[in-house]
Amino acid sequence: METVSSVPVFARKNVAYAGATLCCLLWGSSYPAIKSGYELFAIATDDIPSKIVFAGYRFLFAGLLLLLFAMAQRKPIARLSLQQYGQIALLGLTQTSIQYIFFYIGLAFTTGVKGSIMNATGTFFSVLLAHLIYKNDRLSYNKSIGCVLGFAGVMLVNVNHSLLDFSFSAMGDGFVVLAAFILSASMLYGKRISQTVDPTVMTGWQLAFGGGVLVLGGYLTGGTLVVHSATAVALLGYLTLLSSIAFALWSVLLKYNRVSMIAPFNFVIPVAGTVLSAIFLGENILEMKYAIALVLVCSGIWWVNKPKA
């Protein structure tokens, strides 16, 4: 029988739950930060190449920061086989580069509300893919109920007149759903790689590589990024820091825990993003739907992780 002390720290449920919540709160805080970043760097709403450059620098710097952190911990960052470098490059290309390109193009052809809801389908993909890949992570009644409740919370926080538009745009909604699927699949691939490569090193390299590809692709398609103030640099620094912490911690959590246990916390992201946007961007926060949405999301997470009777 395993004692508590013999269980890896990040495999302990209370640590895993707290860590996953922190990751999603950090990602949620990127919503208002990115909106402010577009203003500070004077990036137009329809300027997708410049948005890709902006995202690319964020991930490139986050990756380099993680590699420096790994070196400070005396972790070898270059003692990888050619196969491992290839695996990490593929991870960076899919999880960071291709996924974000589809996501940004998709958002340009759909509404923000529908984009947020379509992006939340990623949790379903994660749970379904885990069911197909891992024998100890099968789909269950509790997981199904939890995912439905969490998705309902995401829909509720985005309720407005645009939800009455039931049209489906392949270039818009379809690309956002495709981005969500790519992210889910690549995170499961990252879980596999992290069994033989330190999660911090893996995440650092994949973010740096994927971010570099985004920067290059953004500039080649006409994007620019001009620094107008120290505030803009500070904001990019914050986005860099939150990305490095959240992605590295998420990789560690996936290494030691079942995908279906961690993935539903993603439902917290759009709710946290909406609430934090309301707080920091002066939008209306005193709406009952936010409280109900949070209850639905938390209930969904509880159902997914509810012990079997």
Predicted regions and their residues:
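Hydrophobic/small/kink-forming positions within alpha-helical transmembrane segments
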Residues: 28, 32, 60, 92-97, ...
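Glycine-/small-residue-enriched transmembrane alpha-helix faces in small-molecule transporters
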Residues: 1-53, 93, 165-192, 212, ...
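Helix-helix packing/entry segments at the starts of transmembrane helices
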Residues: 57, 96, 114-121, 189-212, ...
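Juxtamembrane helix-entry segments on the extracytoplasmic side of multipass membrane proteins
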Residues: 12-17, 47-50, 80-85, 159-182, ...
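Hydrophobic/aromatic residues within transmembrane alpha-helices
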Residues: 37, 54, 106, 132-139, ...
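Specific transmembrane alpha-helical segments of multi-pass solute transporters/efflux pumps
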Residues: 71-115, 119, 156, 239-257
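Hydrophobic transmembrane alpha-helices of multi-pass small-molecule transport proteins
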Residues: 66, 128-129, 141-160, 267, ...
